[in-house]
Amino acid sequence: MKTINENAPQVSSWQTYRRLLAFAKPYRLLLVAALIAALIEAAGTTGFLALMKPITDETFIYKNAEVSRWLPVQIILLFVIRGAAGYITDMAMGKSARSIARDLRVKVMSKYLRLPGSRFDSEPVPSMLIRLGSDSDQVAQAAVDAVKVMIQQSLQVIGALALMLWHSWQVTLTILVLAPVLAWVMDKVARRYRRISHSIQESGAHLLQAADQTLSSHQEVKIYGAQQSEMERYSGLADRNLRLAMKVESTRGISTATVQMIGAIGLSALLFVAGAQALAGRLTAGDFVVLMTSMLTIIPGLKQLTNVQNMVQRGLASAERLFSVLDSPDEPDQGQVPLTRAKGLIEFRDVTARYPGQANPALADVSFVAQPGTVTAIVGRSGSGKSSLIKLIPRFYEAESGQILLDGHPVQAYALADLRRQIALVGQQVMLFDGSIAENVAYGEMRQCDAGQLERAIQGANAMEFVAQLPEGLQSHVGTKGGRLSGGQRQRLAIARAMLKDAPILILDEATAALDNESERLVQDALHKLMPDRTTLVIAHRLSTIEHADQVLVMDQGRIVERGTHQELLALGGLYSHLHGMQFRERQA
């Protein structure tokens, strides 16, 4: 069976970031407002630094009472404006970031629902949840939150440097000699963060996957005494995640210490050169205080600009994981043949199918015809290819070779949506969603059905006898995955869903295999009401349930090894007869 190619070409950080910024376009007005507010906030910081000169010179040296009275008012006004601008920046950036995360989640979720079935075999659901959860948040942080920090701190650093140049270009140029060293440090930090970020994202997905497997199988874990081994496995994964996290902390600590050391060298240079300028009479005490406070503003700004690299690189690593999903090809859907309601003639012609990475085919040279309105039973040992066969009809997977036809046309000739409207599926593992009974029966495109149709479907599926006893009737909630209902009740709701759909093709995948005798009787009775006038394919575990099938296909190792009616196959004395005899002896025992 065909799969998708997940080996995406390598792209640079800038290409990834540029593509990421495209998600910010719908919010550009918010971002422009945030940028203007950030400029005002940075100007407020620079203005406060500039006030250091009159505060020092006019208040403490020249004793200017008039200036001293107005300076506190100016400082208060400055910080009111700066605070308002900071609030606008935070709100606009926050709204943009959360909106981008929401858009990414919806886009990736929509993409997952358009991917072929092979994707769900190659990527575990916990990994998908990581992409929809923390990956989307970290991408939003990289796209907006990191930009906010970079803009705010960069503007403040630029403003402080401009102020320093204004008061003493000689001192400022002396400090700027350290800029290449700082740039080298930031580049090294960014590269290391990106390497570690990829590993951390994968490690988090493995942790979630391990927890999901263990907790969802808690009964098996307890009954087989596997708590210790599962905890050791999870602990090992958690330890690896911790080691990677500590590498991030180590990088952050080293980079912070390095930036602070560079800042200390800069301060020392400032003191040395400014002292010489002051002795020469070219620098007042106010100028010196401005230079000093500006430098003390620059150092934390540079520190934050270095630390924000972690946020950016983690976001870029998450973006690459999300883009690998968005860039995956959708299910092939180029069908043009119109299809309103199929007659139900299904034909397999020499169909071979293979799962990715498997040497032996799941199906090999399978050929048969299912006439409209007939029942075709598919039986065989576990792993013989029964489920693989029926998954090809709605094109959950694609065949490697051969043809599958519906009403004389290859199934690829129909649009996927039209093809799947012709099929109702009732499986052994019924999937109910956390909602009401009515919402689960009238599911998907059937949401617009009227109350009469819904009740007739539930009545026909022998489900009304238990639905009527529930406190809220059709509006009763079924719980997560239908956990508030028994297996037989869930199965009857699945049959009601199929009845409501009224599709010309019905697929039953071991629909009664896990039920007790009473539940099986009710479900079989409901199925007998559902099957007439439809092309029905039944995967049967209990051979007694398919004795009246129009044809029985016996599969072994991906091939049809016998075919005929129940009586013909018993008379043949082959594999079917052997399986039937085994089940008969089990029932007698």
From Swiss-Prot:
One Pfam family it belongs to: ABC_tran
Subcellular localization is given as: Cell inner membrane
The residues covered by the ABC transporter domain are: 346-582
Instruction: Give the domain of life.
Output: Bacteria
Which reaction(s) are listed as its catalytic activity?
A: ATP + H2O + lipid A-core oligosaccharideSide 1 = ADP + phosphate + lipid A-core oligosaccharideSide 2
Q: Which UniProt keywords apply?
A: ATP-binding, Cell inner membrane, Cell membrane, Lipid transport, Membrane, Nucleotide-binding, Translocase, Transmembrane, Transmembrane helix, Transport
Listed GO biological process terms? transmembrane transport
Q: What is its EC number?
A: 7.5.2.6
Report the protein's function: Involved in lipopolysaccharide (LPS) biosynthesis. Translocates lipid A-core from the inner to the outer leaflet of the inner membrane. Transmembrane domains (TMD) form a pore in the inner membrane and the ATP-binding domain (NBD) is responsible for energy generation.
Q: Which protein family is named in the record?
A: Belongs to the ABC transporter superfamily. Lipid exporter (TC 3.A.1.106) family.
Query: According to its record, what is known about the domains?
Result: In MsbA the ATP-binding domain (NBD) and the transmembrane domain (TMD) are fused.
What does the subunit section of this Swiss-Prot or TrEMBL entry state? Answer: Homodimer.
What is the name of the protein in this document? ATP-dependent lipid A-core flippase
What are the leading ranks of the lineage?
Bacteria, Pseudomonadati, Pseudomonadota, Gammaproteobacteria, Lysobacterales
